[in-house]
Curated annotation (Swiss-Prot):
Catalytic activity: [protein]-peptidylproline (omega=180) = [protein]-peptidylproline (omega=0)
SUPFAM superfamilies cross-referenced by the UniProt entry: FKBP-like (SSF54534), Triger factor/SurA peptide-binding domain-like (SSF109998), Trigger factor ribosome-binding domain (SSF102735)
Domain of life per record: Bacteria
Biological role: Involved in protein export. Acts as a chaperone by maintaining the newly synthesized protein in an open conformation. Functions as a peptidyl-prolyl cis-trans isomerase.
Compartments, record wording: Cytoplasm
Name of the protein described by the UniProt record: Trigger factor
């Protein structure tokens, strides 16, 4: 086998590989003879079909298969010999056979050489937060509101009430599509409607008819309504006040607490809040570390890896439609290219961090991650056993552990300061509620 390597552009490489033509001819001949022994063709006894007949019928297909196998095998030998690391599958272009040699060209991309830079320039503000008794009480109050019952009242509507209404919306005196509803139910303070809508209902009683003035946000989804001033003619048909359940052992039973009553509920709530806080704190620090790593390291990315990631993101997006994708057009790659490129870059950079620091997934950490995740389920031991018996899930957890270890390695050289924050403030920002 003879090999020549050409760097075409960027990360693309072109291998020209020559192998003895007799190598292919022998393989083709052997394959034809094997086929002749097992072929069943009318007019010939089993195992007695002439090779010339087999060649006439199947020769082209057999030669094509053999050629593909020879190219694949010799390509692998060539990249090992040349110490090349392909990113994605190669494209093969077979050439002509001149009687002595068969030549083909393999074009592919390689992984970039990654040299980590600016690791000591990564700046991280590490948040410190804890779950207080007041935070637990606040969560219990939220749970009370979620389990509230509502009853009609003869008074003005206040924040927290539910109201029922009929309304008609108009812009410049003309009704717009989707702006009309009857027997519409809304909880005041929920933030479901555009700014000013809920506030305009406060202070009104059932049976009143009134008009409120609002302005659609510039980022509103309907193009024809963005930034437009509108009027809503409203007929308020009912005001319902919330009745919150008492905080006692019966309240605790609503959440499956059968022993220990209210104190057991508080313990469970605190445990869940601590778990969510720990995950959010880790995610916050990781996000800052990754942002610094990306900002200080610019590397060329293989298009093959980006294309592969685009396909993953596209598939995930289609699955979010509930699998009802049979008649849907394929989502354009442009929707995912930027995110895909970012994910590929992060993967390459973290891979280099793992390689440089010779990191291996720590078994104790892997089991800790599984236990933390399983604690959210009714029977954690069953979930832990399931993960430990599933090779694919275990590999996913090892990858998560390795990523955590890589972030921790980067933190050692980063400029880290600590900032104490309140639980509610931090979690609201982490979940996008702030």
């Amino acid at each position: 086998m003879q090999v020549s390597v050409e760097a075409t552009q960027g990360l693309e490489r072109r291998l020209t590989i020559s192998v003895p033509a007799e190598q292919i001819e022998k393989l083709v001949k052997d394959s034809l003879q094997r086929e002749a022994k097992r072929a069943r063709i009318p007019g010939f006894r089993p195992g007695k079909v002439p090779v010339t007949v087999i060649n006439k019928r199947y020769g082209a297909a057999i030669r094509q298969d053999i050629t593909g196998e020879v190219m694949q095998r010799n390509f692998i030998e060539a990249i090992i010999a040349e110490k090349l690391n392909p990113a994605g599958a190669p494209t093969f272009v077979p050439g002509a056979t001149d009687g002595e040699k068969f030549e083909f060209v393999a074009t592919f991309e390689i992984y970039p050489e990654v040299e980590l830079k600016g690791l000591d320039a990564i700046v991280v503000e590490q948040p410190k937060a804890s779950v207080t008794d007041a935070d637990v009480d606040s969560m219990i109050e939220t749970l009370r509101k979620q389990h509230a019952t509502f009853a009609a009242v003869e008074r003005e509507a206040v924040d927290g009430d539910k109201v029922k209404m009929n309304f008609v919306g108009s812009v410049d005196g003309v009704e717009f599509e989707g702006g009309k509803a009857e027997d519409f139910e809304l909880q005041l303070g929920s933030g479901r409607m555009i700014p000013g809508f809920e506030a305009g209902i406060l202070g009104h009683k059932a049976g009143e008819e009134f008009v409120i003035d609002v302005t659609f946000p510039e980022e509103y989804h309907a193009e024809n309504l963005k930034g437009k001033a509108a009027k809503f003619a409203i007929t308020l048909t009912e005001v319902l006040a919330a009745n919150l359940p008492e905080v006692n052992d019966e309240f605790a039973a609503l959440f499956g607490i059968t022993e220990g009553g209210l104190e057991a509920l508080k313990t469970e709530i605190r445990k869940n809040m601590n778990r969510e806080l720990e995950q959010a704190l880790k995610a916050n620090v990781k996000e800052q570390v990754i942002a610094g790593l990306l900002a200080n390291n610019d590397i060329e990315l293989p298009k093959a890896l980006i294309d592969g990631e685009v396909n993953v993101l596209r598939q995930q997006a289609m699955q979010r439609f509930g699998g009802q994708t049979a008649n849907m057009p394929e989502l354009p790659a442009e929707l995912f290219t930027e995110q895909a490129a970012r994910r590929v870059k992060i993967g390459l950079l973290l891979g280099e961090v793992i390689k440089t620091n010779e990191l291996k997934a720590e078994d104790e950490r892997v089991q800790g991650l599984i236990a933390s995740m399983a604690s959210a389920y009714e029977d954690p031991s069953e979930v832990i056993a399931y993960y430990n018996s599933n090779k694919e899930l275990m590999q996913n957890m090892r990858n998560v552990a390795l990523e955590e270890q890589a972030v921790e390695a980067l933190l050692k050289t980063a400029k880290v300061t600590e900032k104490t924050v309140a639980f509610e403030e931090f979690m609201n920002k982490a979940t996008g509620r702030a």
